Amino acid sequence: MLLFPMESYTKYYSPERVARRKKGAADSLLSEREFLQKLNAYSAWREDIFVFGPSLETVKKAFEGTSYYHIEICVALPGKQGELYKEREMENIYQVALGRPETMIFVRDQGAAWDLFTLGCYRDLKHWASSSDVSEEKRALAARQAGFNSPDEIGPYLRTLIDWHRDTMGVAVK
């Protein structure tokens, strides 16, 4: 996944920002063709989506010290977009109560069919899987604090709101 901060459509497509991107491309160690070849070598699926999400500062902070990522892409059932967003917020309350990182929520503006995606940043696979180390009592309390009846309700509730979803894990490519 590649994230390109835009700030706004007006600013992103302003002559100054277009000139900055052109200069950056000209100064790059890779030609546009070489960049696309490298991108293709690491990509199995490509789709463009424009989203609203956390601030650039929040994204940068989430990426600090991490190299393992969990991405969940969701298409809501008709009329369930708002409830899906709320469910994702509830899951964040649950995660934070367990001492885990909050996932970033990005909401579709244009492009791909997805209504939203979440991106969680972790140090490594063990960090991502660490919720299994939490006691059942603590998980139950965290679920209730987040608005769920139990931790076992979280996944099934999500599925009442979505037509489909994809999730995957990835590592940083540098």
Residue ranges of predicted features:
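Short S/T/G/P-rich N-terminal loop/turn motif that feeds into the first structured element of a domain
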Residues: 1-174
